[in-house]
Structures are given as structure tokens and as C-alpha cells.
Amino acid sequence: KPDSTLNLRFIQGNRMAHKEKFSNRWGVIMAMAGSAIGLGNIWRFPYMVGEHGGAAFIVLYILATVFVSLPIFVAEVILGRKSRTSAVYSMTSLRPDQRIWKYAGYLAVFIPLVICSYYSVIGGWSMDFMFKTFSGTFVRSSTDEVMNLFSGLTGSFWKPVGMHLLFLGACCFIVMNGVKTGIEKFSRWSIPVLFILIVVMIAYSLTLPGARGGMEYLIKPDFSQITPKSFAYAMGQSFYSLSLGMGAIVTYGAYVS
């Protein structure tokens, strides 16, 4: 009882005292989309589709998203909105008398830390290639030449470290500017740009050799390739796509008016 009372008072004292919240629903959607759309969708999802029956895996993924992931997503938003506090103490607010929820909150914070450990490295690589793109380095460059540039980047020490720190610095700058002028403002223009880039990638991929066969494989489900692991992969991909269990959606929910 004393522990639960202390936890409850701590939660109440640490509710988001700020007045800053997302300005409107569009800002919330863009910020949450920025959290959800990532390497798991661009790199991992096509590989999973190719390994598990094409459209058959997409059907499993859609079912997992609609019937499992979306309800959990809504629950995380509601939890954050109701508690108005961090991911850790949002979990603790469920049952202040049971410490397991506090540990679940700490786990929800630890998971993004692990993800950030490699996302930030890849983010540094991306920034280096972005600078090369703007400087015209890739103009008329062959695939082998681009691969050599990447090998040179990863083979050195200081340049990846510098790009890594630059990427982390940019992230910190955005977060330090707050929800409305930082995360929301950045998401409002970066997510549409990301959408345009994805459309360009799709259009370009359709011009590559074997595109017709790939499209046929994509729209014709092959359920014979579905295994028990396929269900687990589809569920995991669905969770990853919506940033579930990582504290991000709970935290964003705390800033929803």
C-alpha cells in the first residue's frame, strides 16, 4: 500500500505539466506516421513478402494489423492520453500497487534505445549519401562505383562516426524544440517528402528487368508457402509497422488534446 500510494503520487506529480500539445489531428497523424514508417517497411517487408508466398503474406499482414495491432495501437494512444505522463509511468498508472507494470514501462523505453543503436548508424550513412546526392556525386555513376563509395564509407572510422554524431545532433535538435515546433513541424514536411520518394522508388522499380514477374508474384497469393513461422513474421511486421510496444505511441498519446 505505501509503495502503491507513493507511485500514484509520483505519477500524478509527473503528469505532463506542459501546455504544449499537437496543434491538430493532421499533426498527430504525421508524427505517428514518422514513427511507424521506417526500415522495417522499406527493407524487411519486401523480403518477408518474397519468402512467404507473395500476396499470401500480405493477406496475413493485413489480418494481423486489423484484428490485433490496430486495437493495441488505439489502446496505447488512449493510455498515453489518459495518463498524460511518460511511457514508464503510463504503464504504472494501470496498477500502481503492482511493480510489474513499472518494469513493463522501463522495457518499453529500453526497446527504442536498442533500436536507436543501429538506426542512428544507418541514419549517419543516409546523411552522407544525401550530401553526396546534392553534390552530384552519383550523377552518371555506375552501381559498382556507388558500392565502392559505400565500402569506402563503412571501411573508414572517423567519417561514419562524424555522420553518426551529426544525425544524433539533428534528432536532438528537433526533439529539444518541443512537440509543436519540433516534431510536428518536421513531420509535416518530411513525411510527404518520404511518400513522394516511395512513389518514385515504386515507379523506378517497375522499369527494372523482372518487374513483370515480380508484380505477378505479388498479386497471385501462394498459400503453399505459408508456414507457422509466416504467422509470427506477419504479426511481428505488423507490430513493427505501427511502433507497438516501444513507448512511442503512448508518449505521443500524452500530447494529444
Where are the model-predicted features located?
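Membrane-interface "cap" regions at the ends of multi-pass membrane proteins
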Residues: N7-W43, I72-V77, R81-Y103, S257
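Inter-helical loop and helix-membrane interface segments of multi-pass membrane transporters/permeases
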Residues: A17-E20, M48-H52, K82-L107, S120-K180, ...
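Membrane-embedded translocation segments of transport machinery
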Residues: A17-W26, E184, R188-S257
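Transmembrane helix-boundary motif of multi-pass solute transporters/channels
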Residues: N24-A64, G247-G253
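Hydrophobic alpha-helical transmembrane segments of multi-pass membrane proteins
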Residues: M30-A36, I62-F67, L107-Y118, L166-F173, ...
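Transmembrane alpha-helical segments of multi-pass membrane transport proteins and ion-pumping complexes
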Residues: L39, S69-F73, R81, L113-G124, ...
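Alpha-helical transmembrane segments and their helix-start/interface "positive-inside/aromatic belt" motifs
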Residues: G54-I62, R99-S117, E184-L194
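Hydrophobic alpha-helical membrane-insertion segments
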Residues: A64-F73, L107-F129, V193-A203
